[in-house]
């Protein structure tokens, strides 16, 4: 039985993948990118209006969803007995990935290139590290794996391809092979969105989540007076 929490990763994957390709289609249609000169980076497609507005909205909402998914995943791993420090390391890696995604969307390359590249580093590199850490934890701790037996190997394959393509993207860009490097960037983005989408399988084991407010002890209300209840023996 799949609960509503399992829909969040699926929605994130569908939203982000369709959103960036819509931005690409608009950029090609209004000729802000010219395919005859080479295949563009995602950031180039989202640098010019009107698609830059859509690009920002897509990545901002995607970042918010990714952050919430990382928080839910943190609590799931905690309930599975994962210790605090590795769990928090995974959580903060995911949150920084979400932050980088928002930075990429709001600081376009043509306006704030250094800030944009810093956001891209957080989104791509730490996004990949986020899933590698979970794979390592799953391997060492023998954590539960909801879903089919091939989910784990599939994640391993996607993370491996993602790592190879990130390295290739950087090397090809340094060698001025921009079109091939851009193609690698697109594939990496799709793989990361797919990896987030696969968390739907893990969340299928969750029925719901509850937000609890924990006040400081000094601000807690005084305990209620004890009440004696008659007991008949």
From Swiss-Prot:
Annotated family: Belongs to the DRAM/TMEM150 family.
Extracellular side: 29-51, 106-116, 177-185
CC terms in the record's Gene Ontology section: autophagosome membrane; endosome membrane; plasma membrane
Function: Modulator of macroautophagy that causes accumulation of autophagosomes under basal conditions and enhances autophagic flux. Represses cell death and promotes long-term clonogenic survival of cells grown in the absence of glucose in a macroautophagy-independent manner. May have some role in extracellular matrix engulfment or growth factor receptor recycling, both of which can modulate cell survival.
Tissue-wise expression: Highly expressed in the colon and lung with comparatively high levels also detectable in the lymph nodes, placenta, duodenum, peripheral blood mononuclear cells and spleen.
Keyword annotations of the record: Autophagy, Cell membrane, Cytoplasmic vesicle, Endosome, Glycoprotein, Membrane, Transmembrane, Transmembrane helix
Source organism per UniProt: Homo sapiens (Human)
Glycan-bearing residues: 30
Family annotation (Pfam families): Frag1
Biological classification of the source: Eukaryota, Metazoa, Chordata, Craniata, Vertebrata
Transmembrane segments: 8-28, 52-72, 85-105, 117-137, 156-176, 186-206
Subcellular location(s) per record: Cell membrane; Endosome membrane; Cytoplasmic vesicle, Autophagosome membrane
GO terms (BP aspect): autophagy
Topological domain ranges for the Cytoplasmic compartment: 1-7, 73-84, 138-155, 207-233
Name of the protein this chain belongs to: Modulator of macroautophagy TMEM150B
Induction: Is not markedly up- or down-regulated by DNA damage, nutrient deprivation or by exposure to TNF-alpha and IFN-gamma.
The keyword Cell membrane is assigned to this record: yes
